[in-house]
């Protein structure tokens, strides 16, 4: 699973806030799946959750211009990969747009 977008934000701190807000939007709804966000560096985090004993992980990385999400979808969930990418992408876009508009 791959997703990338030009974030259009002036600094990495605001991009990080967007990642945290997007994660937070799903954390409560997906609480049964034990969601987890781990920051490995200032510009790199791993998001993981477990569904039907299958682990789904995604690495979120960003630089001055671009935000990228690269994840592993277990074989069992391959038919849903496009939907997962779409949901992740739209949630990130929503928070990035709010940040660009000065709402967060």
Each PLM stretch: what is its role?
Residues 35-40, 60:
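Short, exposed beta-strand/loop patches in secreted or surface proteins that constitute
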Residues 48-66:
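A short, structured beta-strand/loop element
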Residues 1-18, 24-29, 34:
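Terminal, regulation- and interaction-focused segments at domain boundaries
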Residues 49-53, 72-77:
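Secondary-structure transition/turn motif
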Residues 39-47:
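Short, hydrophobic/aromatic-rich segments at coil-to-beta transitions
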Residues 77-104:
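A conserved amphipathic terminal alpha-helix motif
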């Amino acid at each position: 699973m791959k997703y990338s977008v030009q974030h259009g934000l002036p600094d990495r701190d605001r991009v990080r806030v967007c990642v945290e807000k997007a994660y937070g939007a799903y954390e409560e709804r997906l609480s049964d799946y034990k969601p987890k966000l781990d920051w490995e560096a200032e510009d790199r985090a791993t998001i993981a959750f477990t569904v039907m004993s299958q682990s789904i992980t995604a690495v979120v990385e960003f630089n001055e211009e671009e935000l990228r999400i690269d994840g592993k979808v277990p074989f069992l969930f391959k038919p849903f990969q496009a939907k997962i990418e779409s949901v992740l992408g739209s949630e990130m876009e929503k928070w990035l747009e709010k940040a660009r508009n000065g709402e967060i």
